């Protein structure tokens, strides 16, 4: 009984509750969830989808055991523990038929002359981009703000603008990104991280600990926020 987290004769039982954004689920987390399901078929996996900011709220409300979040994330508190599991960069992509910038490097001020496609203002990515542009004395006003990186790529592909998306996403599209080019920015965007996050006052369930173990051996840093 209890939380049904005992080791039964046929393996680990219980539930794994995890929160992550669309992009993180699809382009990073899915392979780990597949492996976990194969290793522990007796564990029920519940994935709750939200922005990285929204996932912090899920964690604070004890609706999930773990979240995978972009860093930096201004919503994280001193009660959360983070383990970095991946470094990545955000890149600008566009259709060269509409934006012939291949082999060129744009100044950030020049980039502002073109329609920019970004995630919505309620995301860590938007917060990060606005801070970056502000640090170069530019006020970022996107042409389009969406809740989906996949849709941003689709709009960039048909020439509606220059989209900002994480590099690991494009590396997973298996050739579909061939119609897009990387638009080089002279002032390079700082690297960001993906991190496993849990609440220090809430002990991890046995299932959550097993999932965490997939990453802890290769974790690049441990920090409190």
How would you label these PLM feature ranges?
Residues 13-76, 146:
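Central regulatory/effector-binding core of bacterial HTH transcription factors
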Residues 51-56, 60-64, 70, 125-181:
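Hydrophobic hinge/microswitch elements
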